[in-house]
């Protein structure tokens, strides 16, 4: 068995030991966010797991990312060589895809032990039954999960800075995509000092056991179950507003933490009224940019999507019998609401049905650790005291993957740190987790497998571009189409010409 604190500590130690100083925040002046994927291996003998002597599991960080920023729409490139979204959760997921690609190569070439075993169909693989994956984030995902109720008479885990949220200028700035410095506002700490934020009490349920139960819903939801019908398409404005006011017992919700993520076109939109009614919940949102709007969906939305389609993406689905799902999400110590997390990650797609074989709406354990990330905004703000200058998000993003070749990558503005205008477009100016490099790694995997052992989806037609390979993953595309039709109809998609590179 494992606990949320064990997962957090493992990730914090990995960050301190395995990630370089380059790309980390400047002490007392910058902060960042951390995310990772942890592989959990259950003991071979499940019978040894008893209340008196719990079974020990093997835990290993297989991907990690830091970062707080996105590029604006005007900086996007059709060559696939820039990272549009450098939020930590997205960086960690892409590094996880690198790890999966490497493990598929090990399996297909029979060189070393792999996390994959042969599936029942030709050319397909599936995850070993004794393995599962836990996603860790030092902070609540931006977007819907960060619309957190503030209750009276409860302790606030981070020191706020006084600001009058009732003033129209402050309200406007908090929801404006173009507001400077708004790259990552998972929550807004600049709330009135008199307000108290709800921190979910930790329960004995923090300890997680192995085995067949690891896909069951988990975590204390004090405010009652989310309605099965909640998703961004079918909630009325009144229903959305009501959800924000749900509170345990007789506690009064006096406000909500703001998210900088803005509602996508086609959604109901925020009321922006003072207090708890400021946001509508359950809506799809895009990440804020600095002067230039982004096309990057919020991390809450992306993680909800991964929970139906898997973390592997379309390319890797060619080789997999079923998607690679996360079994649990662990959040570090920060402003947090169990209700908001469950609503954002699982509640909005509960009624999705008629998915293709292998795909399904997964139940997900959602837990919080008591351990604070030392380079989070809260931690740095508490330490810096009277240090001169503003506290700002770190401009760099660090990527790490458990692969033998070039496991580390440090980027800024979507390119490897140090890239100049003259070098943009060259091989040296590509992150290892850019779309074009992930495509190159996928093609490298194909080159090492005899063509007659390729899965049918790759042999029936000639595939050339990134778009070709994605569209040929028919089961994945069918699942994605179903999810959009039934829950995420307003999802922003990039035009096809951004995927025509090869």
UniProtKB/Swiss-Prot annotation:
GO terms for biological process: tRNA processing. 1D-myo-inositol hexakisphosphate binds at residues 93-94, 302, 305, 435, 470. The modification Phosphoserine is found at residue 191. It catalyses: adenosine(37) in tRNA(Ala) + H2O + H(+) = inosine(37) in tRNA(Ala) + NH4(+). Keywords: Hydrolase, Metal-binding, Phosphoprotein, tRNA processing, Zinc. SMART domains: ADEAMc. PROSITE patterns: A_DEAMIN_EDITASE. Binds 1 myo-inositol hexakisphosphate (IP6) per subunit. Residues 63-501 form the A to I editase domain. Zn(2+) binds at residues 87, 142, 299. Its EC number is 3.5.4.34. InterPro entries: A_deamin. Its cofactor is 1D-myo-inositol hexakisphosphate. One of its GO terms (molecular function) is tRNA-specific adenosine deaminase activity. The active site is at residue 89. Belongs to the ADAT1 family. Specifically deaminates adenosine-37 to inosine in tRNA-Ala. This is tRNA-specific adenosine deaminase 1. It comes from Macaca fascicularis.
């Amino acid at each position: 068995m494992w606990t949320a604190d064990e997962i957090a500590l493992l990730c914090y130690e990995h960050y301190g030991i395995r990630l370089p100083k380059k790309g980390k925040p400047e002490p007392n002046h910058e902060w960042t966010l951390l995310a990772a994927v942890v592989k959990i291996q259950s003991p071979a003998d499940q019978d040894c797991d008893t209340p008196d002597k719990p079974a020990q599991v093997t835990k290993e960080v297989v991907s990690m990312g830091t970062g707080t920023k996105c590029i604006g729409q005007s900086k996007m490139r059709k060559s696939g060589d820039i990272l549009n979204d450098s939020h930590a959760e997205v960086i960690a997921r892409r590094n996880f895809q690198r790890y999966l690609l490497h493990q598929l190569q090990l399996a297909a070439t029979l060189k070393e032990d792999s996390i994959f075993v042969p599936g029942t169909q030709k050319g397909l693989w599936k995850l070993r039954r004794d393995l599962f994956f836990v996603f860790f984030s030092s902070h609540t995902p931006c977007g819907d999960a960060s619309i957190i109720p503030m209750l009276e008479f409860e302790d606030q885990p981070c020191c706020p800075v006084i600001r009058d949220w009732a003033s129209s200028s402050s309200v406007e700035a908090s929801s404006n995509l173009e507001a400077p410095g708004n790259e990552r506002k998972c929550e807004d700490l600049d709330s009135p000092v008199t307000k108290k934020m709800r921190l979910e009490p930790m329960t004995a349920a923090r300890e997680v056991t192995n085995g067949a139960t690891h896909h069951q819903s988990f975590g204390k939801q004090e405010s009652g179950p989310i309605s099965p019908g909640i998703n961004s398409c079918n909630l009325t404005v009144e229903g959305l507003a009501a959800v924000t006011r749900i509170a345990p017992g007789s506690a009064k919700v006096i406000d909500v933490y703001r998210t900088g993520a803005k509602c996508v076109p086609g959604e109901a939109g925020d009321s922006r009224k003072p207090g708890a009614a400021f946001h509508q919940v359950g809506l799809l949102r895009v990440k804020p940019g600095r002067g230039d709007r982004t096309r990057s969906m919020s991390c809450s939305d992306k993680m909800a999507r991964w929970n139906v389609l898997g973390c592997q993406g379309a390319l890797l689905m060619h080789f997999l019998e079923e998607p690679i799902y996360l079994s649990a999400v662990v959040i570090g110590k920060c402003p947090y609401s169990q209700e908001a997390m469950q609503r954002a990650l699982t509640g909005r797609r509960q009624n999705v049905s008629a998915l293709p074989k292998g795909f399904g709406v997964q139940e997900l354990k959602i837990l919080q650790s008591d351990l604070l990330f030392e380079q989070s905004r809260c931690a740095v703000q508490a330490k810096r005291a009277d240090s001169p200058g503003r506290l700002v998000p770190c401009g760099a993003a660090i990527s790490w993957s458990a692969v033998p070749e070039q496991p580390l990558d440090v980027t800024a503005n979507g390119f490897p740190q140090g890239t100049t205008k003259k070098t943009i477009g060259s091989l040296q100016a590509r992150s290892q987790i850019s779309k074009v490099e992930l495509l190159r790694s996928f093609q490298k995997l194909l080159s090492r497998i005899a063509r007659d052992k390729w899965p049918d989806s790759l042999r029936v037609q000639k595939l050339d571009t990134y778009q070709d390979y994605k569209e040929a993953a028919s089961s994945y595309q069918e699942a994605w189409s179903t999810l959009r039709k039934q829950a995420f109809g307003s999802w922003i998609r990039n035009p096809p010409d951004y995927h025509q590179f090869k």
